[in-house]
Amino acid sequence: MNWKEAEEKASRYLRHKGFKILARNYRTRFGEIDIIARYRGYLVFVEVKSGNSFFLPRTRVDLQKIRHIQLAANDYIMNTKDSFKGYRIDVIEVTEKGIEHFEDIQI
């Protein structure tokens, strides 16, 4: 499965769970955020990783990647007129076995 298919599956999964998708592939000078969503008044910045289940794709989300997502998220926040309670960073792993959603990733 390619990255585009993985992001589409992740978007469908989030919508099914009640998330409202605000943007996909949001690009900044700091990097790209795969999915930006709203859930229960919070902004959720989602990194999507795909691959096989033998090598867990989520392990490719390291400290540097999270920092880049935080910088890109701050860029989005500075440029949005939406109000929100707060934000978090999630990781969604898409493999042939299914989808795993890791919420509120911390560094």
Swiss-Prot record:
InterPro entries attached to this UniProt entry: Restrct_endonuc-II-like (IPR011335), tRNA_endonuc-like_dom_sf (IPR011856), UPF0102_YraN-like (IPR003509)
Regions that span the bilayer: none
Any GO molecular function: nucleic acid binding
Domain of life: Bacteria
Xref: HAMAP family: UPF0102
The family this protein is said to belong to: Belongs to the UPF0102 family.
PANTHER family xref list: UPF0102 PROTEIN YRAN (PTHR34039:SF1)
Protein name, per record: UPF0102 protein Tlet_0667
Organism: Pseudothermotoga lettingae (strain ATCC BAA-301 / DSM 14385 / NBRC 107922 / TMO) (Thermotoga lettingae)
